[in-house]
Amino acid sequence: VGETTPQYTDFQDDGKYSWLKSPTFYGKPMQVGPLSRVLCMLAAGHEPTKKYATAALDLVSSVAGAKVGLDAMHSTIGRHAARAVGCAVQCDELAKQWDLLVANMARGDLKTFNRPEFPKGEQRGVGFHEAPRGVLSHWVVIDSGKIKNYQCVVPTTWNAAPRNENDQPGAYEASLIGNPVADPEKPLEVLRTVHSFDPCLACAVHVVDQENKPVVTVSAV
């Protein structure tokens, strides 16, 4: 767990400051999202993922007239293909979840949420979730039922991370290394590659007061 210390003063043409954090897993930057999910599920022997990933690669192989293996997934179009594979797997799972929901309702279980109960005093928690763009994590400090501190590390934080203190590039930068560009004046290949991660601009937007004064106050009734 690190601490974010903003260094921004004003806009500078020569500056290379990024508002994004540089999260690491065991000291290394990570790519998150559909491709990561598909590769991890294949490594875990998940049969539905294997079924649809194999079908996708077989289809591409027939169109290309040559065998296209799993290594081809590490590419711009591979990330889009992984997104389609993931959607197919999730559609099958959704049908199963729907049947389970209907069965629960038939037994009289109509609950839609669990009402939260917070003990008195300071409580700390963290939650991880696999969102469509990739892994999403939230950290929170709650004091007597009120949020005292909150931080998110979202999928785009991982993928768009700038180089860290060990000079390790984030996923965007790493994916662009060696990427051919037909026209340097119109580097559409760069745009296409970054778009394949489905970037979220809001994930790098923050409102900060340099003197640590409250920026906005919200009253919840």
Residue ranges and their predicted role:
Residues 1-221:
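Metal/cofactor-centered catalytic core regions of large enzymes
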